[in-house]
Each structure stands twice: as C-alpha cells, then as structure tokens.
Amino acid sequence: MKSRRIICIVNDIWENSDEVWGFNTFRENGYCVEIWRVGALTIGTKIWEKPQFSYPVITIESKKELDSKILKMSLYKPIYLFYFSESKYFDKEKALIKLLGGKYCNVSIGPLGSRDNHLQLREVMSRKRHWMDNFLATYNFLAAEIHKCGLHSKFEAEYENNIMIHTYDYDYYLRNQNSKSKCGKEYILFYDQNFLEHKDIINYGIKRRITNEKVYIKEISNLLLKIEMEYGLPVVIAAHPTSKNANLKKIYGSREIIYGKTCEYTKNAKWVVTCASGAINYAVLYKKPILFWTCYQIKNSDIYFEWQCIRCNILKAKILDISDNLKGNIQNYLTNPDNYEKFMNYITSNPNEKRLFFDIVVGYLNKM
C-alpha cells in the first residue's frame, strides 16, 4: 500500500520545524510529507531559512504557481495542511481543493497573537454566514478557543470538526515534565528577543524597534545589574533562536547564555524577565512570577507595545519602564501566579491532556 501524501503549507520553516510542526510524527505514522513555503505571498518573506531536514521543500512565489501545483497534485489526492493562525489567506485555493475532490485542514498551534484577538472573534461571531462555509476544512485543529478569531463566520466557529488542542509551547511543557536544569544553582531567567537583528524586521517590513543600540544596551545592563544586586542571584539569558552569539555577548556580557532550553530553564528559575516574549507561556505553565519591562524605544515602535499590553492586561501585570529611573522596588512589578488561570485558556484547551499536538492530529487524519 502506497503512503498517503501530506502537503504542509507554511510561511517558512525553521531548524526544529520537523519536530514542532509534526512532520516527523506524520512520517512515523506512514505519511509522505512535502512542504510548500508561501511566506512570499502572506507576509512578504525576503529571507528564507535553509532547510535543516530531509523533507522535500518547495518555495512558492505566486498564487498562479500555487494554483498550478494544486491542480497537478489533485491526481494524488493529498491531504493539505494550512499552518496559519488565520485561515483566510488562501480561501480560493481551499475552495479549489474541495472542488477537485480533495481535502484540507487548518492548523493553528501558535501562542496568543499581537492583535486584539477578542475583537476579531466578536466580528467572526457576528457574521452568521460566509461563502467559505460551503468549502469548510475537514478539520480545524486549533490551539485554543481564541484561535477561532481566524475563522470566517459564526457557522464555522460552531463547526463540529473544530478540534481544540493546545499550543506548541504546551508540547514542550509535556516533553520537559521530568527534566532538570544543568545550572546547578538558583537563578533568574531573562528571555532574549533579539531586538537588534531579528530577520522579521526585514521580512515583515516593520521599522526597527531599537534605533539607538548604545542606549538600549545600557538600559538592559542597568536592569540586569539591579536584579542581581537586589536578589543576590545570577541572571541567565535564554537566547532567542535567531540571536547570534556576538550580539548576545555585546548586550549581556559574561552572563550564562543557553540555547534551545527555555522551557527546561523556566521550570527551574526563581522567576523570569521579559518584554513580551511568547515564552511567557512556560512561566505561566510553571507558575513563575514574571517581570515585564519596556523602554522608550519599544513604546514608540510599531505594534509591539500593544502586543505587550494585551498580555499584561490578561495577567494583571505592571510594566517596568527601564528608560525611567530604576529606583523603585522590582518586587512590586512581579506578577502574581494566582492571576494566571485566564491566560491558561490561551495555552491549552485541556490542562489534563498528556498527548502531543500532532499525535492528536494524526488520529483524525487517519480517519480521512
């Protein structure tokens, strides 16, 4: 019996996408996986990641090219998986798949987004019907209820095949339940977000958040020194995956820097420090106090401060402005883990779930 083909339609791929986005799980369950990168069509991607794994990867540069490939693939009857928090990017292509007798699913596995998702969800629920209701996905695999904000109508939002699961951060949490930090001592964890050189600055066409590096580095240095002096604990830096070591040393000096172990190190941290990293999901899961900081340059950049405020409002958190003087007591800015229950709804639909996201997905794909 020939393996059934899965076409994973993504903006781009990263070093660990094969694990995070289920490609390995699909292959282990007998599926043939092919990846189509469409970031040039959705977010204007200009810098592509180099594939780090053996799956076929095709970069698609136009809607015409995408439609042509869907037509050619119709003979093989693949399952299409669209990896987006909003399902509306490729409505016509999804309708074409259904008209050709094919099947597709939407996959939304990411954390809470940067826009007012609640407002979007209200708009969806106020729209009784949409033409795409005639071409619904076989399944919508959603990380949380709020991800229905990317659907088209109240009819689709109440669709019986909306499968509520959890975010990929919850997958990491499940994998790291029995892990232990190698730090060997108490520490405070700082979530680096690579504000100086993140490729999204180019890919998304947003203005650079940090325009004066010297001022930014001085403000971060003062914050970390204050934390270490007040608490008598070292600050460990959880590096962003896109950060280069040279820049990290320039910002954080001789402090310990860890890569790819943010979940593990959050579990064993005293508390964490962040501007608005998606990694706060780990802090919420492990009920760690969070210190949110901002600065003049962040507050005056694109939508990022809005993104931070959304998270802080849900967590009832104060934000420490490190561009002002740092004479206040940091303890007054730490979040209270008792306020995390509401935020948990953005991380998982079932706190008792022990299965990984794509283990659940495969069970449904096997029925198609």
Which sequence ranges carry the predicted segments?
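Active-site and donor-binding regions of nucleotide-sugar-utilizing enzymes
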Residues: 6-30, 35-174, 279-280
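Conserved alpha-helical elements of sugar-nucleotide-dependent glycosyltransferases
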Residues: 14-22, 216-220, 353, 357
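Short, flexible/disordered intra-domain loops and linkers
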Residues: 44-55, 117-124, 197-215, 300-306
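Donor nucleotide-activated moiety binding/catalytic core segment of transferases
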Residues: 58-68, 167-169, 174, 236-286, ...
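Structural motif
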Residues: 78-80, 187, 270-271
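A short helix->loop->beta-strand "cap" motif at the edges of active sites that frequently abuts
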Residues: 100-103, 233, 287-288
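Catalytic binding pocket for nucleotide-activated donors in carbohydrate/polymer assembly enzymes
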Residues: 249-253, 278-351
